[in-house]
Amino acid sequence: MAWPCITRACCIARFWNQLDKADIAVPLVFTKYSEATEHPGAPPQPPAPLQPALAPPSRAVAIETQPAQGESDAVARATGPAPGPSVDRETVAAPGRSGLGLGAASASTSGSGPADSVMRQDYRAWKVQRPEPSCRPRSEYQPSDAPFERETQYQKDFRAWPLPRRGDHPWIPKPVQIPATSQPSQPVLGVPKRRPQSQERGPMQLSADARDPEGAGGAGVLAAGKASGVDQRDTRRKAGPAWMVTRNEGHEEKPLPPAQSQTQEGGPAAGKASGADQRDTRRKAGPAWMVTRSEGHEEKPLPPAQSQTQEGGPAAGKASGADQRDTRRKAGPAWMVTRTEGHEETPLPPAQSQTQEGGPAAGKASGADERDTRRKAGPAWMVRRSEGHEQTPAAHAQGTGPEGGKGRAVADALNRQIREEVASTVSSSYRNEFRAWTDIKPVKPIKAKPQYKPPDDKMVHETSYSAQFKGEANKPSAADNKAMDRRRIRSLYSEPFKECPKVEKPSVQSSKPKKTSTSHKPPRKAKDKQVVSGQAAKKKTTEGPSATKPDDKEQSKEMNNKLAEAKESRVKPTSDASKNRGPVTKEPHKDQGSVAPGLPKGQEPLKDQGPVVPGLPKDQVPVVPGSLKGQSPTAPGPTKDQGAVLLGPVKDLGPVAPAPIKVQDHIASELLKNKDSVPLAPAKAQSPLLPEPLKNQSPVVPASTKDQSFPTPAPRKDPGPVIPEPEKDRAPTVPERRKDQHVSIMASLKNEAPMVPESVKNQGLAGPELVKDTGTDTTAPRYLKGHDSVFVAPVKNQGPVIPEPVKSQDPIIPALAKDQGPMLPEPPKNQSPVVLGPIKNQDPIIPVPLKGQDPLVPAPTKDQGPTAPDPLKTQGPKGTQLPTVSPSPPVMIPTVPHTEYIEGSP
């Protein structure tokens, strides 16, 4: 068994139980668990003496877990027979070992015992002075001779709701049984009068119980034998759940009766009973149910045998026998026993009537009474029922008991008396039977005083904690209202000592939040960017302090200015860079508006990629504007090399942007215009291009290029459909386009596969053809020439393409590159950011891709700080992207102008 978690209570028990069965000895250091040493199955301590001998005194202190004499010993021990308790095992092991010829082993056995291994065979109880015996009960429970009070007070007090028995209709009188009893010539027969009584379980039962003893006693007559027998049997407590006992009594005898009737028909017919009883007298071993069955069913068949056996026997025998049997406690759950008693007899009566037609017939009844005399184990209700059923006959028996001979008359009289009593006590048996107990005094319910008294005064929602952080002016006042609060807050924060830290804090905050803003709230970020990092800073500042004191406008402004300044210096590098546009971003951010006049236009979209724009400006500010507008996202990508291009494409579709970027102004515009539609086509063509652009834009292109064609498709993810086509087209295109505008085209294509036709037309890049000859081609080349990023820009466009750039951004592209078209999805994964970012057109896409693209963006970012950042901003992954970006700056494709960015920008 595997080592259980031996520290949990549930396992400790299991552990100890299975310790002896385990395959390994657990070298636990328990000092007091006797169980560790005494295996329940093992002979009690006899082996203990051996152990000391086996183990040297030194060993006496602790069990040894290290192999003392070497592995051979362990092996031998393992091999050696080692069943039985540890001690036995050891002894066994020793011979085995010596037999093996392991001198060491034998030595160890004799000397240190199993010191060497932790195999089960080696397990040795410690040779410590025996721990004091454990309180844990030994394996089996040896019952003491003294009777054990089986019934708890609860059980004694318990009165079961009278559950109707099947076929027991208390409202229907049961006269038949009486006739049955009377039928037998034997007067005794009256005994098994009828069940009704049992049905009238209420008071009747009590009376029956009360009577029982006397009845039983009174029924000294052997005739009462059966009854007495039964009673005696009951006298001995029945072991087992009452229900079992009850069933036993009931069912057992139920079937029994017929048997009995046959059996006892002869004088010895009763013999069976006696036989059964004697048999029962000895305790029955085994589960009560088994016992019960044996008693009930056993007897069922047994009777014949017995009857033959005991034919000579006294007819009453059975009854008496049964009683004796009952006298000895019945083993088994009380319920089983009870049932036995109850049902057994229940039917028994009729049977008995036939059976006991002989003289002893009455015996059974009396027997039943005696049996009942002894307390029945089991829930009282069960017992009662059994008694009720049994006793019904028993009661009669009691009446008849003395001299079952008295016979019918006595039985009838008794029955009548019982019936009368019952009737007097309660009106109808039915009502009696199914009626809530009325003898219980109703308890007057006590209304508990409510424990919780709500405070009269209004609740003060101030805790000692919150109290520490109250502004000076912020003391709650009765007249609080919003205006007052605001004023208070304003005054609070405009205080000089507070203001300073405030301002400072915002600046600090700005750097961090800035980033956050970028990543988390692209829309807002876009706006911020648009506004300029300054505004972003302001926003940030505002956010920080604002939460605290929204009203502090002047300060906000101040702070914003400061922040803006800091941000501009910092943002250029930091903000934008952080955005993922890295370097480019910074500039763009700072000036986003200024960075690309045109760009800004596009920048709105760029906004997201504000940083990109700056980059673009680098190569092709003019282009950027157009492209930006169309593909502000793209611009960022290009920004690095061709920030503009990227943005353009990004915005609409990376693809257009790429060419546009360089040429971007018009192209971008066109692209933008067409871009949405065009990019897709371009994507097709572009994929091929991309690869080349990758080449051109070493950073972006390399990885990008490789896969770019593929990546494009991936980016195309957005344009999904496009991707396939682009791929197709792209494959061929790639070569040319790659060179010229592979990237751009790819991006565009990616983004706008559908657009391809137009795109292609509009932006040479977009169309595969275009790619080859189109201005796009030119553009692409330019881009490439001008800035590898251009290619990126397209990438941007093709959110999917981005992956290509991503490729550049090693992480993303790789996957993309491979499957570019299909991969797009993956690429986005890899460069999710890129893909998304790039797909300007795919605004929707962008969102998804963004995530994926974030990485892409970073790739571009690397090359074109701005681009990446924007995307980054847009895409939470910005951080990730950055790393990616570094691999492929061109990847600017960040195109990422995310949907978010885009949203923000407007």
From Swiss-Prot:
Basic and acidic residues bias spans: 119-139, 147-171, 496-505, 549-573, 715-742
Keyword list, A-Z: Calmodulin-binding, Cell projection, Cytoplasm, Cytoplasmic vesicle, Cytoskeleton, Golgi apparatus, Lipoprotein, Membrane, Microtubule, Palmitate, Phosphoprotein, Repeat, Transport
Subcellular location: Cytoplasm, Cytoskeleton; Golgi apparatus; Cell projection, Axon; Cell projection, Dendrite
Topology of this chain in the membrane: Lipid-anchor
Residue numbers spanned by region Calmodulin-binding: 1-15, 124-138, 160-174, 187-201, 235-249, 280-294, 325-339, 375-389, 435-449, 486-500, 513-527
Bias (Low complexity): 93-117
Residues the record lists as Phosphoserine modifications: S98, S185, S207, S632, S687, S905
GO BP terms in the entry: dendrite morphogenesis; lysosome localization; microtubule cytoskeleton organization
Disruption phenotype: Mice are devoid of cold-stable microtubules and show no detectable defects in brain anatomy but show synaptic defects, with depleted synaptic vesicle pools and impaired synaptic plasticity, associated with severe behavioral disorders, including a disorganized activity with disruption of normal behavioral sequences and episodes of hyperlocomotion or apparent prostration, anxiety, severe social withdrawal and complete nurturing defects. The behavioral defects are alleviated by long-term treatment with neuroleptics.
Segments of this protein annotated with the region Disordered: 37-56, 65-411, 441-651, 674-782, 817-906
Molecular function via GO: calmodulin binding; microtubule binding
GO cellular component: axon; dendrite; Golgi apparatus; microtubule; perinuclear region of cytoplasm; transport vesicle membrane
Polar residues bias: start-end ranges: 695-711
Expression by tissue: Isoform 1 is specifically expressed in adult brain. Isoform 2 is predominantly expressed in embryonic brain; expression persists at low levels in the adult brain. Isoform 3 is expressed at high levels in lung and at lower levels in testis, heart, muscle and kidney (at protein level). Oligodendrocytes express a major isoform of 89 kDa (O-STOP). Astrocytes also express an isoform of 60 kDa (A-STOP).
Ranges where the record places region Mn 1: 116-139
Residue stretches of biased makeup (Pro residues): 41-50
Region annotation (Mn 3) ranges: 427-450
Segments for region (Mn 2): 151-174
Reported function: Involved in microtubule stabilization in many cell types, including neuronal cells. Specifically has microtubule cold stabilizing activity. Involved in dendrite morphogenesis and maintenance by regulating lysosomal trafficking via its interaction with TMEM106B. Regulates KIF5A-mediated axonal cargo transport. Regulates axonal growth during neuron polarization.
Self-association state and partner proteins as the record states: Interacts with calmodulin (via C-terminus); the interaction is dependent on Ca(2+). Interacts (via C-terminus) with TMEM106B (via N-terminus). Interacts with ZDHHC13 (via ANK repeats). Interacts with ZDHHC17 (via ANK repeats).
Listed name of the protein: Microtubule-associated protein 6
Provenance organism: Mus musculus (Mouse)
